[in-house]
Each structure stands twice: as C-alpha cells, then as structure tokens.
Amino acid sequence: MSSSLFILDENLEPLVSKNIRALPNLSSVLSSFKQCYHDGSPPILSQNDWFFIHLKRDFLHFVSVIHTTDKPNIDLMTILAFLEQFYHLLQKYFEIEVLTKNVILDNILLVLELIDECIDFGIVQVTDPSIIKDYIRVKVNVPRVTVDNEEWSPGEESSSSSGSDSDSEYSNTNKRKDKKKKRKKKKGTKGKSVGKSKLKSIMVNNKENRGINVVETVKETLRNKNDTGKEAANDELPNDGNDLYINGDIAKTIIMPISWRTKGIHYAKNEFFLDVIERVQYLMDFEKGVIRKNLIHGEIVCRCYLSGMPKLKISINKILNRDPQFMSNSSFHQCVSLDSINTIEKDEEKNSDDDAGLQAATDAREIEFIPPDGEFVLCQYELKRHVKDAPMVRLKDFEIKPKLKKFKIQIVTKIQTNFKPTNSTSKLNVRIPLTKVFQEYKIDLSKQIRFKANIGKVVFNLSDDFLLWEIQTMKGHREHSTNKSSQYNSDEDDPNTCASMVAEFPLFNQEEYDRLQEEMKTSMNPPPLRTGPRLEELYRQVHDQQTSHVTPRDKLVNIDFEIPYCTCSGLKVEYLKVEEPQLQYQSFPWVRYKTVSDEEYAYIV
C-alpha cells in the first residue's frame, strides 16, 4: 500500500503531496528520494527502509512511497501502472497534451480530489476518466486569452494542432451535440435518462473559482411513464442546473462487472467512430545500407456515442488469419472479452476434420465488448517488418556535391514512395541537416541562396541549420528528385513522373572579397545598396554562443508524413456490428485508417 504520493517539478521540488498513511515527517522521506535519484535511475528505488516508485512525464515527477513492511502485500508494478494512469487522467481533466508546473499549481484542490477518488488508504480504486468525471465536476482553472472575441486556451490549441483535420471533425461533432442538448433542455425535453425509480444526485458548487464546496443532496422522485413514454412535468430536472446533477447509477458502476460504463446514457444520434492509426518507426544507415529499426506501433482508437448498454462485434483480418505476431504483441482494453477467440481455438481443434465446423468457427472469430462512453483505446499492437519490405517513404539518394571551381555547393536528395497509387500523402516533409556542411565548408550567406522546386517549397532554418522541404501531397509510387539539371536516362527519371528540388549555397571566395575591398578603397562611388536581411550577421549572432560539434541528430534526414486511408501492416476491419437488444436503435459506425511516421523515421547520412 502506498504511504504517500508526491508530484514534483523538474527540480524535484514538491508541488502536491498527499500523506495517505499519516507519516510523521514527509520532508525526510522526500529528502531520501532526492539522495538516491539521478538521471537515468530505474523506476523503482530503495533508500532508508523506503521504496520509491517514480515516473517522469513531461516536466513532472510522479512518486509513490511504500514502506518495506508493506512490500510483501503489494505489487510494485501495480503502483507504477497506477502512476501512468493517473498521469493520463490529469491530461483528460485539463484537456492538454503537456502537463506543466503552473497547471498543477492552479488546480491543487482538483488534483487532491482526484487522488482521493483514485486511491483509498493506499489501495488503488478506479482511474477511469469517464467514471471519475461524473463524480468530480469542477471547472478547470486554465489561462484563457480573448482573441477576436473568442476565448482561447492551451488545451484547445494542443487538441487542434496535434490532430489532423479529420480529428477536428470529431470535436466539432461533440460541440454540435452539446448545443443540441442545450436546446432540448430549454424546450423542456429530457437529455439524459437518470434511472427508473430513484435519483441520487450530488451537486457541485464552484463559485468564482475560489474553492470547491460539495453539497450532497438526495432527492427521491417517482417517474410514472404512460403509454406514450412521456413523463410528468413535476419529474423533470431544473433546466438551468442539469449539468450539476449526476446519474444515481454511477455509484453502483464501480462495483459491477461492467465498471467502465454507467447505465442511463442517452444520445439523440448514436454513432461509433473507430480509427486505426499506425506509426512507422524506421532507422537506416544510408551509407552502409543497414536497417537498424523497422517497426509498426499501431493502436485502434474509438469514440463511442451510443445509448444504453450496446454490445459491439468487430472482426479484424489479423485475427481471422490467426497472425501469430499480432496475437502475441497486442493488448486490448479491459472491456474486450477474448473468451470467444479462445472458444474458437478449441472448436478448431475439435472440428479440424469437419470443413463445415471449421468454416463456422472462422466466421465467428470476432471481438466482442461493451464499450465505455467517450474516447478510449481499444487495442495496441507492435509488429516487426521484414528487412526486405520497402519503407513507406524511401530516401533513394542523398549527395552533397561541392563545386569548388565555381565556389558553389549543391545538396541533392531523392525520395520515393512505396504504397498504392490510389493513395496519397496528406503531409510530407523532409528535413535535411546542414550542420556538417557549414562546418566543413565556408558558406557565404551574404550572397543569395537558390532553391528550385517544381513541387512544394523549401525553407531554410537559420538557427537550427536545416532545410525543410514541404511537399504535402504526393501519390504512391512517384519519385521526387532534387536534381533537375541532371540527365534522365531511365523511366524513373522521366520529368513527367519526377519532381525536383535543388539547393545551392555559395562558398566564400577570398580573392573576390579582397578585390572588392580594394575597389571600394579607390572608388568614389558609394557601395551598392543592399536590401533584405543580412543573413551572415544573423547567423553569427545565433551561433556565437553555440558549440561547434556535430551531434547524432545532425546526421539524420528526417521524413515526416501522413497517409490517410492506408495501413502499413495491412490490418483491416472486416465488419463492425452494434447491437442493443433493449433500445434497438439505428446506429452509425464509422471506420478510418491512417499511417503516420513515428518520431524516429530517419536515415543516417
């Protein structure tokens, strides 16, 4: 059992501390953790009869303290998993991607309330955001700035910038649903079912963000339904404060077998969104031709807006084909029941000689689950690609061509896609490092730098020394070459099927510089007028205080892409069924696919 819980900043200074077991001196316990902690420490440390389970996320440290006498009665990995889930819970509440020190300090009371609900006397209870949000309804204190008569918060920016345009459709859908619910409440209609016989409610009163006053009121109302299904006017909740009341079935949910979904959920339009997102991790030594990493990190993200207690059935081709790598390296949400798959394996062994029985078992191989309300991750998996499998976007050629006689240097890059011609990228950016070029050659930034591209555009980052080639849309099996002046000797180099870009940097000419200086001394004419920014002065100011060594990152050509309607592993959802035997409503399931590059998708040059 956890004795205490800390949230520390990056300097290991306490932001929030919760003394669960009434320890006499928390400061001495924290000082023991500071003594044994260092960069690169394992997640579990021991010092002075104390065990410290710590987790670093963003700019914060989450630390749980356990005494040695309690260690035999608790699983340390369970506490580590709890810290991870608690971090995601804070993200859901604050609606931001990165937790900072200021956000925690501005919401200390809310964080303490969340700790009390998640853990009871050191024992983990529940960390599901959809359940806890119905218990603790507190307005989050986040900074807001008025821009063009509209309020803006950091969470709104992170949610809109991190996702694509398709992800913003979901947020817009939620906003439209909230507006519809508010209109219905104003008209006097019922927005959410609150049980059959009795209603237990908790009213949360938070005035001017000065404190949290929780007033518990218990109201019992009889709901008599007539043949038309309408309720009496006296049974309706007040329209102005419906958001302050919670469903009475929530308290029973956490002790029921289906603890991730409450009863009494109702939506006017029943929809279910399923996204298959695969992140490709690829690292290759371009000079040696050795592939160091070639992995696929996939996840199935769902957004559920269904009424009642629906039962979903999903069939995936990887399960139908009994892919051993997928089955051994995949993890599912707690709502998924894998009993049907295990039963099918037994039926296949029994009916191995019976073709009809084997076909029936194959048709019935599916995932069955009752989804939680809102957004959740249904499945996570990791697959290894074969060495001979071509990457989705391949660096075909990278060459630095110095032309010393002309005092110029050219950088040539070729990339090639390897997916279906019917698909195309919605985003494609190539990051070309220049640190090595600026160290080995003396670049003259006083002269004009030339870029030529018949597709996309090229941006020169002066402070970080790299070129960013923004291509955006590119169809499958189409090659882009950065050397337009080269001779095309094959079909692959046909200018009709190739796009080119060339970056040319001028080299410093000492003889020309001395000659111009002598002419300026003897000439009566003023120096020529120069317009535009002086890049050489800006570069000198930026790089004067920086070290001049080449880091491993400066040798990587990074490729950032996004391919909608495509999966690298070939995973496909065969069908998706929604069944609700009591309500029997019409549902609208949606399935999408997307392949994106991981943070490490690069070539070592």
From Swiss-Prot:
Keywords annotated in UniProt: Cytoplasmic vesicle, Endosome, Golgi apparatus, Membrane, Protein transport, Transport
Q: Name one GO molecular function term.
A: clathrin adaptor activity
Which residues lie within the region annotated Disordered? 150-196
InterPro entries in UniProt: Adaptor_comp_med_subunit, AP2_Mu_C_sf, Apm2_N, Clathrin_mu_CS, Longin-like_dom_sf, MHD
Q: Where is the composition biased (Basic residues)?
A: 174-196
Give the record's family classification.
Belongs to the adaptor complexes medium subunit family.
The remark listed among the other comments is: Present with 2890 molecules/cell in log phase SD medium.
What is the name attached to this protein's record? Adaptin medium chain homolog APM2
Organism phylogeny: Eukaryota, Fungi, Dikarya, Ascomycota, Saccharomycotina
Q: What's the encoding gene here?
A: APM2
